[in-house]
C-alpha cells in the first residue's frame, strides 16, 4: 500500500470498506456503482478516512450477500484489514465512463440550485438517495431559498425539466407546497 494521494478534488467516492472477511486480510466492501461489480473494474483505489489517504491495488474481488469481498495487494492479515474499516474507496473522475448528453453522475447534480416552474428557488441538491423505484434528490435550503424546508424530489423525467451544469441550475416541475 502506498501513501501517495491523488489530487483530492479529482476523486469520486465509489464505495466504502465496512468490515473484514476471513483471516487472510480480505475486506467487505459496499459499492456505490451500478451494477455493484463495476467497482472491480478499477484496479487502483485511493482510500480516505479521517484525513488519512492510502493508495491500494485490487488483487481480486467477488460478490457476496451484502456487497463485495475484495483482496488488496499487500493486505494479508485480518487485524491489518480491520484498520481499513470505514475507509471510502475513491477513483479519479477521469476514469468514469462518458455518459450520453442527457445522463449525469450523482456527483454532478450535488450542489445544483433547484428552481421550479414558477422561478422559486427551493435550495441546492445536497445528496441523492436510491429508493428502488427512482432516485430521489435531497434539496436543502440555501441563501435566497423560498423557505427553510428540506425537500425530497424524485429524479424523474416528469419532475426534472432541464439541467445546466455550467450555470449550476436544475429546473423542476414541482409545487412549492409539496
UniProtKB/Swiss-Prot annotation:
Residues 101-178 form the PRC barrel domain. Keywords: Chaperone, Cytoplasm, Ribosome biogenesis, rRNA processing. The lineage of its organism: Bacteria, Pseudomonadati, Pseudomonadota, Gammaproteobacteria, Pseudomonadales. GO terms for molecular function: ribosome binding. The gene is rimM. Belongs to the RimM family. Transmembrane segments: none annotated. It is found in: Cytoplasm. GO terms for biological process: ribosomal small subunit biogenesis; rRNA processing. Its main location: cytoplasm. Binds ribosomal protein uS19. PANTHER family: RIBOSOME MATURATION FACTOR RIMM. InterPro entries: PRC_barrel-like_sf, PRC_RimM, RimM, RimM_N, RimM_N_sf, Transl_B-barrel_sf. This is Ribosome maturation factor RimM. SUPFAM superfamilies: PRC-barrel domain, Translation proteins. HAMAP family: Ribosome_mat_RimM. It comes from the Bacteria. It comes from Pseudomonas putida (strain ATCC 700007 / DSM 6899 / JCM 31910 / BCRC 17059 / LMG 24140 / F1). One of its GO terms (cellular component) is cytoplasm. The PRC barrel domain binds ribosomal protein uS19. An accessory protein needed during the final step in the assembly of 30S ribosomal subunit, possibly for assembly of the head region. Essential for efficient processing of 16S rRNA. May be needed both before and after RbfA during the maturation of 16S rRNA. It has affinity for free ribosomal 30S subunits but not for 70S ribosomes.
Amino acid at each position: 500500500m502506498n501513501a501517495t494521494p491523488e489530487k483530492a478534488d479529482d476523486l469520486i467516492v465509489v464505495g466504502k470498506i465496512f468490515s473484514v472477511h476471513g483471516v487472510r486480510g480480505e475486506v467487505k466492501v459496499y459499492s456505490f456503482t451500478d451494477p455493484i461489480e463495476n467497482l472491480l473494474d478499477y484496479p487502483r483505489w485511493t482510500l480516505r478516512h479521517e484525513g488519512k489517504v492510502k493508495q491500494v491495488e485490487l488483487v481480486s474481488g467477488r460478490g457476496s450477500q451484502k456487497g463485495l469481498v475484495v483482496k488488496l495487494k499487500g493486505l494479508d492479515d485480518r487485524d491489518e484489514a480491520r484498520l481499513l474499516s470505514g475507509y471510502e474507496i475513491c477513483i479519479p473522475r477521469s476514469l468514469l465512463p462518458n455518459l450520453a448528453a442527457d445522463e449525469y453522475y450523482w456527483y454532478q447534480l450535488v450542489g445544483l440550485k433547484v428552481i421550479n416552474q414558477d422561478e422559486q428557488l427551493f435550495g441546492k441538491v445536497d445528496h441523492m438517495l436510491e429508493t428502488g423505484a427512482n432516485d430521489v434528490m435531497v434539496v436543502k435550503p440555501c441563501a435566497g431559498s423560498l423557505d427553510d424546508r428540506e425537500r425530497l424530489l424524485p429524479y424523474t423525467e416528469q419532475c426534472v425539466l432541464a439541467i445546466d451544469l455550467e450555470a449550476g441550475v436544475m429546473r423542476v416541475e414541482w409545487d412549492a407546497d409539496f
